[in-house]
Amino acid sequence: MAPALLLVPAALASFILAFGTGVEFVRFTSLRPLLGGIPESGGPDARQGWLAALQDRSILAPLAWDLGLLLLFVGQHSLMAAERVKAWTSRYFGVLQRSLYVACTALALQLVMRYWEPVPRGPVLWEAQAEPWATWVPLLCFVLHVISWLLIFSILLVFDYAELMGLKQVYYHVLGLGEPLALKSPRALRLFSHLRHPVCVELLTVLWVVPTLGMDRLLLALLLTLYLGLAHGLDQQDLRYLRAQLQRKLHLLSRPQDGEAE
């Protein structure tokens, strides 16, 4: 295992890369479609119908490219989460295993965002054109996106963000405290194994709630929706644990108010 002087910078570099990628992902999924950053090609009249688009190589080629990028990201994200791969990376990278996973995921997502090919000439599933929808629908989408991202950031902070990013593992190792997950209860570990993406509903809102849903955005939303759905396996025990934890936190938050009332 590398000395602490090397572990800490490596974990911080992974965190900075992930943070920058997260900011770029907000721009890619929200700011660009909501603020008109996707290049147009003559407006709605220049778009083809669905049957014509499915026979047009100039539309199918970028869609196939985008699909390849998404499969690359999903493949990396799933492969490195497999138990055998995690055991191998833990053997050679130790406490940096999670940081390595986060860094590779960020790099794969960077590839998706940087080389994504829009399809402005393709058909759209829906589009807000006529007034007042052309004004109010983008505004409503913007508000929902802002709320969703605020919820995402709040949930990540509550859901042991430092452990998810790999920082806590290195911090505990340097202080000789062992593995962070080893200190959690069996019910918490069970929940974490079922729910490593604790922001599913909010991400789905960001992916689907847009003023214009074109072919490339539809591909992005569909594939990530399927992946998020398959990555979640909550059952009744998990829900009971979440409900108990929520009630416990609310009880703790209400204690100062009870003291003041007395």
Swiss-Prot record:
Task: Report the principal subcellular site.
Answer: nucleus
> How does the entry describe its membrane topology?
Multi-pass membrane protein
Membrane-side (Nuclear) residue stretches:
1-4, 81-97, 165-191, 235-262
UniProt entry keywords in alphabetical sequence: Membrane, Nucleus, Transmembrane, Transmembrane helix
Question: Transmembrane ranges?
Answer: 5-28, 59-80, 98-114, 134-164, 192-210, 217-234
Record topology, Perinuclear space segments: 29-58, 115-133, 211-216
* Entry's Gene Ontology cellular component terms: nuclear envelope; nuclear inner membrane; nuclear membrane
Which compartments is it annotated to reside in?
Answer: Nucleus inner membrane
Q: Does the keyword DNA damage apply?
A: no
* Keyword Nucleotide-binding appears in the UniProt entry: no
Q: Which family does it belong to?
A: Belongs to the nurim family.
What is the protein named? Nurim
Species: Macaca mulatta (Rhesus macaque)
